[in-house]
A protein has these predicted regions:
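Generic structural motif recognizing short loop/turn segments at the entrances and edges of beta-strands
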Residues: 1-2, 8-10, 17-22, 27-34, ...
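Beta-propeller domains with acidic blade repeats across secreted/periplasmic ectodomains
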Residues: 43, 48-270
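Extended acidic/polar, glycine-enriched regions
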Residues: 3-65
């Protein structure tokens, strides 16, 4: 049995074919809030406590409270550069396979890192030479994220299925809300090679990513997404496997890998 309690607005349960039940919501310029209760038995009105929806929008308790620490091995200057070695916590209590796939930085210097298996970690460096790194798991369950960009201090992740924007609603260091910021029907390919790469922005706030056209039903291309995530367009097509998208002041650069008789094509979009 289906019970319906309308908390705000107008709605009712109407019967459908084969015993189905539909909820008909009356047109209204305001939001409609309702509670649906289900019972396996025939009852006059399924009961139960109504949970305030706002309580579900404030963020929940941390799921991954353990903070990991790894070492930094300072590099020796070599022809003007010193390459430090940042240790990755390959052994971790969550069994997370730490294959780093993308990274970007917050304004305070913290680093957001994604892994191919679908995690996002926040990495904080301790002050001073040789300071340790503190790793905190921020999100999990994303679909092979190969691009990450911090915009307005919010982590945006380019997975195989969409751009996801991550919100920490209660400031406890973990994402509570995984917002589907942008998705298109052409983005997912069944092939094992249908990868979607990178995530960059231009000065106007547009996003860019590239997608493989090799052994894939996707169009090998560079895609431009509007700052609000609502519109997208191809700005470069007929690319084989353009893994390597960079942003410079004059535009976007792409490197397309050659193979066999394929011709290397790198180009800049001004």
């Amino acid at each position: 049995e289906v019970g319906l309690e309308t908390l705000q607005g107008a709605a009712k349960v109407v019967p459908g074919a084969d015993g189905a039940r539909w909820i008909a919501i009356a047109p209204s310029p305001k939001a409609t809030e309702l509670a649906v209760r289900l019972s396996p038995e025939d009852v006059e009105q399924p009961g139960g406590e109504t949970i305030p929806l706002q309580s579900l929008l404030d963020g929940g308790p941390r799921r991954w409270p353990i903070e990991l620490q790894t070492a930094v091995a300072p590099g020796k200057p070599l022809e003007g550069y010193a390459a430090d070695l940042l240790t990755v916590p390959f052994a971790n209590p969550y069994g997370s396979w730490m294959r780093i796939s993308a990274m970007d930085f917050f304004q305070d210097g913290r680093m957001a890192v994604s892994t191919l298996s679908g995690d996002v970690w926040i990495v904080t460096a301790e002050k001073g030479p040789g300071g340790a790194l503190r790793w905190s798991r921020f999100a999990a369950g994303l679909y092979e994220p190969l691009g990450l960009k911090v915009v307005d201090e919010l982590v945006h992740v380019r997975g195989r299925d969409r751009i996801t924007r991550l919100h920490d609603l209660n400031g406890d260091g973990e994402a509570d809300y995984y917002e589907s910021f942008h998705e298109d029907s052409h983005e997912i390919g069944a092939s094992y090679h249908a990868f979607v790469y990178d995530l960059q922005c231009d000065p106007e706030g547009n996003f860019y990513y590239s997608q493989s056209g090799y052994k894939s039903p996707l169009t090998g291309a560079v895609v431009k997404v509007s700052p609000d995530g609502k519109r997208s367009s191809f700005i470069g097509r007929d690319l084989r496997n353009p893994n390597g998208l960079g942003s410079i002041a004059q535009g976007i650069t792409v490197a397309d890998n050659p193979s066999g008789k394929a011709v290397f094509n790198g180009f800049m979009l001004a």
